[in-house]
Every structure is written in structure tokens, then in C-alpha cells.
Amino acid sequence: MLVFLHAVFVTVLILLLIGRLQLLERLLLNHSLNLKTVNNVLGVTDTGLKVNCLQLLKPDCLDFNILYRSLAETRLLKVVLRVIFLVLLGFCCHRLLVTLF
């Protein structure tokens, strides 16, 4: 019974982590879209001027590759956590059925 309770507890924690990761993914997408919009609105051919304008608006995240890599890592982590969640859910159901019958 104690193993079952631990599995349920870990399953709930994984669900909370998945929710937080979805929020992080939305924030990263929003940040990426904001930078693309600023980039398209400026439409300046001189990249130096464009980067300077972007630095004024968003100084902490200029590299799109880093942003996309973080987004990909967030999505991968979310998939891994969902797989772990499904395995633990199956284990909980199995333990519950064994306990009842």
C-alpha cells in the first residue's frame, strides 16, 4: 500500500511539472513571436542597426537558436515526463487491481 501511495504522489508531481513545462513553452513561444514581430516591423536592411534596435527592446535574448533550442528541450522534457506519467499510472492501476482482487 505504501508503494502505491508513493507512486500516486510521484504521478501528481509529474502532472504538476508537465503543467509548468507547458507554461514555460508558451512563454518561450510568446517571446519568440515578439522578437520575430519586432524583426519584421523594423525591416531594416542593415543588420547592425536591426541588432541595436533589438538590443534596446529585448536585451536578454537575441539569439534565436538558443531560444529554439530551449523550446525543443522543453518539448522533449514534456514528452519524457508524459511517458513516465503513463508508466506510473499503469503501475498504480496494476497495484490497485492486485490489492482489490
From Swiss-Prot:
This is Non-structural protein 7a. It is found in: Host membrane. It is a single-pass membrane protein. May function in the formation of membrane-bound replication complexes or in the assembly of the virus. The chain crosses the membrane at residues 81-101. Keywords: Host membrane, Membrane, Signal, Transmembrane, Transmembrane helix. GO terms for cellular component: host cell membrane; membrane. The keyword Zinc does not apply. Residues 1-23 form the signal peptide. The keyword Repeat does not apply. Coiled coil: none annotated. Disulfide bonds: none annotated. InterPro entries: Corona_7. Belongs to the coronaviruses ns7/ns7a protein family.
